[in-house]
Amino acid sequence: MSYIKNANIQGNAWVAQGACVVGNVTLGDESSVWYNAVVRGDMAPIIVGCGSNIQDGTVVHADAGFPCKIGNGTTIGHNAIIHGCTIGHNTVVGMGAIVMNGAEIGSDCIIGAGSLVTQGTVVPDGMLAFGSPAKVIRPLTEAEKKENQTNGISYMLMKNIQKD
């Protein structure tokens, strides 16, 4: 069973069994929080945009003074740690990546799997960044930006299958 306490779950958002969503958390319409993920807004607000997905085993948390905002259509890969940061629309944060307090990741970005985005790092719109610490590598191609959107849409569809 999922655990939801004091969260604002909007429209057709979905929280999987075993996931935990607590505190000052808003899940936008069509967003999803997958198995064993934790979204914990006990110290500062967390907003997950419409159609975004928080995949299995991920932790999203916010510290006092560092709220967390995830844009629309964004994918947070399995076992990522998202902590007190801002992530734009249609961005993919790869599996196992860590994004720290005060980091700002733009829209239409990819953060490579296993990357560490350190506190206060800024990744501009449309960029690929990876490494530990993560560095901007190059602009995304239009095909990569489209794939980000396709990924988000596929998770919206999978969410609807899981709910049935």
Region spans (language model):
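Glycine-rich hexapeptide-repeat left-handed beta-helix
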Residues: 1-9, 42-50, 56-58, 62-63, ...
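N-terminal first-folded block
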Residues: 6, 11-47, 61-65
